[in-house]
């Protein structure tokens, strides 16, 4: 690749990107970040690299390119766009898109990668509009992956750190849903049942006009029924041992 300066490399990279030659585009942008790291073009080159890498299915490499901007160019005027691009990479992984090692070898989707990127969004831009929904998505992935503790942690942060967010009501309902998934029946430990009841109640009290009220009422009724039956089971247990002890 023969270019005279950073501007020429950027122009050639854009041309290659538009033509779908992502490998060539990466080569031109690599020249910019390697040879002209202090130029005004360097952060944009990293951004364009991330776009080419996403097209090649190299999602974590795309994230790494975006992180170079966050770490090296924190005053970049389009910082929020970078956070949005990171969010988009995580959402792509969450959707089940096939990653490609080295851009050509298909591999398995690793949903933990999406969680990692969403966590980075929250850490790097805690006051952005992306953070609350990133936490919600972490909880959804974690629940699907049977990582309830991770789901609880994300939802707890969403409820406490972003109480005015449009996703706060969903967080209460999601918290109740995750606790409900842990309920094994009236014969078992009722801590998840009590917690589910608590969050269903909170949802109905705090968000009485939300569209999911009927769903919350159904969940609350089911959990209250389970808890009531657990009281009967415990009563039968004590009655039996009191009379047969």
Give residue ranges: language-model regions.
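Acidic, polar-rich low-complexity tracts and alpha-helical solenoid repeat scaffolds
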Residues: 1-245
